[in-house]
């Protein structure tokens, strides 16, 4: 199986994926086949680089790290404009470059992992599928519904172990007892529910029980909600586990304040 990865880095950064680990992403897709193309499309402020040497060194250092993991980095210079109010606005849209290269390089690929939530890629996904390419979307928050519906499969980036590191936790502690992991809700009952989360090996899914008392305040749980939680031994089921200290990461709706309308997150 020949695999390609195409990352809309700016979209991912602005949509909950700031700080993703490129080495983890490479290792994740490698279990399904050979990663032939690994492309990341990033924006850089070339004007700032000419005067801010700390920013320049930091940017070059980051790009070098990403390249060391086997990724080709395609940079797009930020162009600055003034809006009608005189405010300075920067734009660096790499969507066209990314779309063209996906179409050109797809003839050598079987599956493409597309990291973006941008609905502008809907037609590109359709074109790739018409060429016999499987397209899987990985994103965090603010995913276009149209893009979601076109994908052959969607996986929240939060669910890939350590793709986005858990705060103040070693990578090897993901899913260990009394440590944190992330999972999605697949069953809601009267006062309790169940989630699935990927084990540290990134291959096997595990089930975990949760009680509504562990939900964030004022959150009404929905199917497919994504949570970060602590894994603890169940006091009732021998060998069982339960989720505590649950934190919502991605949800369809939050319970509104009085007088507010429900606010969709996706």
What are these regions (language model features)?
Residues 1-90, 94, 119, 134, ...:
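Domain-level signal for Mg2+-assisted phosphodiester chemistry and nucleotide/NA-binding surfaces
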Residues 122-152:
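VWA/integrin I-like adhesion module and closely mimicked acidic/polar interface patches used
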Residues 149-177:
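C-terminal helix of von Willebrand factor
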Residues 174-190:
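Structural detector for short beta-strands of small beta-barrel domains
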Residues 190-198:
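Short aromatic-glycine-enriched beta-strand elements
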Residues 202-213, 242-243:
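A short macromolecule-binding patch
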Residues 213-230:
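Short nucleic-acid-contacting surface segments enriched for D/E, G, S/T with interspersed K/R
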Residues 233-263:
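OB-fold/S1-family single-stranded nucleic acid-binding modules
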């Amino acid at each position: 199986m020949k695999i390609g990865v195409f990352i809309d880095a700016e979209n991912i950064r602005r949509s909950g994926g700031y700080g993703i680990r490129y080495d983890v992403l490479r290792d994740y897709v490698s279990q399904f086949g050979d990663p032939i193309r690994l492309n990341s499309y990033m924006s850089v402020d070339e004007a700032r680089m000419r005067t801010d040497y700390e920013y320049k060194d930091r940017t070059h250092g980051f790009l070098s790290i990403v390249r060391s993991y086997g990724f080709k980095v395609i940079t797009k210079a930020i162009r600055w404009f003034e809006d009608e109010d005189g405010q300075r606005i920067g734009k660096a849209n790499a969507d066209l470059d990314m779309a063209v290269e996906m179409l050109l390089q797809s003839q050598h690929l079987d599956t493409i992992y597309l990291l973006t939530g941008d609905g502008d890629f809907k037609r590109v996904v359709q074109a790739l599928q018409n060429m016999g390419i499987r397209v899987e979307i990985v994103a965090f928050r603010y995913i276009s519904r149209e893009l979601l519906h076109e994908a052959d499969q969607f996986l929240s980036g939060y669910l890939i172990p350590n793709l986005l590191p858990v705060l103040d936790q070693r990578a090897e502690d993901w899913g260990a007892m009394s440590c944190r992991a992330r999972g999605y809700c697949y069953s809601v009952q009267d006062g309790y529910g169940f989630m699935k989360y990927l084990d540290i090996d990134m291959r096997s899914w595990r089930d975990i029980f949760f009680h509504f008392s562990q939900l964030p305040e004022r959150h009404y749980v929905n199917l497919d909600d994504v949570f970060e939680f602590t894994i603890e031994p169940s006091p009732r089921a021998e060998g069982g586990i339960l989720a505590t200290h649950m934190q919502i990461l991605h949800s369809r709706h939050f319970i509104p304040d009085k007088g507010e309308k429900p606010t969709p997150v996706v």
